[in-house]
Amino acid sequence: MKISQAVGNACTVPASNVETHNNNPSRESKIIYLPGTNCEIKSQALLSAFTSYRVGGAAELYVAPRNIEALQASLKYAQEHNLRVTTLGAGSNLLVSDRGISGLVIATRHLRYNRFDHQTGQVTVAAGESIPSLAWEIAKLGWQGFEWAVGIPGTVGGAVVMNAGAHNSCIADILVSAQVLSPDGTIETLTPEELGYGYRTSLLQGSNRVVTQATFQLQPGFDPAYITATTREHKQMRLTTQPYNFPSCGSVFRNPKPYSAGWLIEQSGLKGYQIGGAQVAHLHANFIVNRGGAKANDIFCLIRHIQQEVQERWSILLEPEVKMLGEFQAA
């Protein structure tokens, strides 16, 4: 069994960013009840509603456990039936193929809780908690250190896996530990060092473990009004520099130091370039937006075109930050 934490190609998309899932199950819808839980596995669940691009086909099987026991039962079911597992958070850094995904998709969106330790300034948060909501809650307490994250449209689990960041800060800077679940049901607590963090990456990517919760170290004791105002400034900065009026996945490409991917794309004359319903955003060139009616393959082909143009002009192959799941067909 292989587990992909979410967050195909020919030619230009690096293989490390592609998980090939050939979804060719029976079209008959069914529900499988997991013994000893209030959890059910559904077949042929459309994933477009669960991704920020609002595109993508169906999951062969889909489950959204509400507690660790149900999550363990879901992994056990996948292991017993030799199913590939894909973990889905907010779907904000994910491109799902129009053909869908085979195996079992486990959504963590119902794993929700947080515990604040007001003496130490630490907060322990479940994998399904929203990063922006957490940022506002922390700000209202007057705790410093999470203001930068208010504009990241994802969940705690996904942020831990990809080492999400903004404004020269990232998850690795404040993470104390992450609790992860293995397919055999064992739970480990790992430090940032054990997670092997790098720029937008960790050892959890492509591994067979699922993040269940994370503990962050913040700095309490500040004026809540001040921290809230700072958080609002970060949010406003995102709103004025990034497109929020159309569905997107956030930044599409990693920044190839010392350049910014957005600058390279803009200097290549690609702002506004469109394939089908997918367009390079006018406001920020490292965003691809769904202008309406886009297919996942439109977005994939636009990613490929951007890579080709930038490589021809700058001899730099942009590496996607977005995770692509399923089979795609290049134009």
UniProtKB/Swiss-Prot annotation:
Catalysed reaction, written as an equation: UDP-N-acetyl-alpha-D-muramate + NADP(+) = UDP-N-acetyl-3-O-(1-carboxyvinyl)-alpha-D-glucosamine + NADPH + H(+)
Source species, domain of life: Bacteria
Keyword terms of this UniProt record: Cell cycle, Cell division, Cell shape, Cell wall biogenesis/degradation, Cytoplasm, FAD, Flavoprotein, NADP, Oxidoreductase, Peptidoglycan synthesis
UniProt-listed Enzyme Commission number(s): 1.3.1.98
Cofactor(s) required, per the database record: FAD
One GO cellular component term: cytosol
Signal peptide stretch: none
Principal subcellular localisation of the protein: cytoplasm
Transmembrane segments: none
GO biological process: cell division; cell wall organization; peptidoglycan biosynthetic process; regulation of cell shape
Root EC class: oxidoreductase
Localization in the cell: Cytoplasm
Protein's pathway: Cell wall biogenesis; peptidoglycan biosynthesis
Residue span, FAD-binding PCMH-type domain: 54-221
Gene Ontology terms for molecular function: FAD binding; UDP-N-acetylmuramate dehydrogenase activity
Similarity comment: family membership: Belongs to the MurB family.
Protein function: Cell wall formation.
Name of this protein: UDP-N-acetylenolpyruvoylglucosamine reductase
Organism: Trichormus variabilis (strain ATCC 29413 / PCC 7937)
Name of encoding gene: murB
